[in-house]
Amino acid sequence: MIAGGELAALPPQAPQPAGTPALVVRRLGCVDYEPTWHAMRAFTDARSADTPDEIWLLEHPPVYTLGQAGQPEHLLRDVGIPLVKIDRGGQITYHGPGQLVAYLLIDLHRRGLKVRELVTLMEQAVIDCLAGYGVGAERKAGAPGVYVDGAKIGALGLRVRNGRSYHGLALNVDVDLAPFSSINPCGYEGLRTVRMKDFGIADDVASVGEHLLTALQRLLPPVYPAGRPPA
């Protein structure tokens, strides 16, 4: 597991010369939640108009996170897993080993994206990734995320500051689902959760991460120099 201090020391990208890639991908392994959150915020605060966007692929040790709309009563019982109150949208969720997390540090204006469009893009990337494994997944009206036969397999939550996003999405690969029984996932009582392993998929988190990354890269609009697509 990468130490929090190492992650927090990731340097913000300085203004970049022409030809710099529009997207930097960091594969971070299993990293503690709070240092990762602080590093995302620091990156977002320090970035300039020329800083390349980044996607961080990783896992977290067991942790519950409670978004800005979260209500503490959705933590049904104390099972010894830390609870962290954070600044993303949404309610309570669980992260743990075996769950793929992708954080999207994106300049929305530069790619001509609105917040709702980025949310839809993330959902579609998960749907496309699962389709590549032969699993049919879908959205659910009024309940952000990705579902298979009504059970949640992918969660998402964002924070946007000055037109720049951080946080992102989580996809259950072979994560232990037991901790979800101690919460109302995303604020929904009795919501079932599933993982890719339940459908006979043996790929590990790193392998699934590469498939998800391909889907995200395919769906993300290019960086437009003027900050918006040409008319």
Swiss-Prot record:
Gene3D superfamilies: Bira Bifunctional Protein, Domain 2. SUPFAM superfamilies: Class II aaRS and biotin synthetases (SSF55681). It is found in: Cytoplasm. Residues 49-224 form the BPL/LPL catalytic domain. The keyword Acyltransferase applies. It comes from the Bacteria. Its main location: cytoplasm. Belongs to the LipB family. PANTHER family: LIPOYLTRANSFERASE 2, MITOCHONDRIAL-RELATED, OCTANOYLTRANSFERASE. NCBIfam families: lipB, PRK14342.1, PRK14343.1. Catalyzes the transfer of endogenously produced octanoic acid from octanoyl-acyl-carrier-protein onto the lipoyl domains of lipoate-dependent enzymes. Lipoyl-ACP can also act as a substrate although octanoyl-ACP is likely to be the physiological substrate. This is Octanoyltransferase. It comes from Aromatoleum aromaticum (strain DSM 19018 / LMG 30748 / EbN1) (Azoarcus sp. (strain EbN1)). The gene is lipB.
